[in-house]
Amino acid sequence: MKVRPSVKPICEYCKVIRRNGRVMVICPTNPKHKQRQG
C-alpha cells in the first residue's frame, strides 16, 4: 500500500474508490498498485 498525495490509476484494472472519506486505488490484477491518499 503506497500512501501518496495524489493517487492515479496505474493500469486499466485499477479502480478509484472512496472509503471512510479517503480516496484509494485498488487493483485486482496487481496488488502493487494499491494506493491511499493521505
UniProtKB/Swiss-Prot annotation:
Domain of life: Bacteria
One term under GO cellular component: cytoplasm
GO molecular function, one term: structural constituent of ribosome
Annotated signal sequence range: none
Keyword list, A-Z: Ribonucleoprotein, Ribosomal protein
Record keyword Glycosyltransferase present: no
Keyword Ribosomal protein: yes
One example of a Gene Ontology biological process annotation: translation
Family, similarity comment: Belongs to the bacterial ribosomal protein bL36 family.
Protein name (Swiss-Prot/TrEMBL): Large ribosomal subunit protein bL36
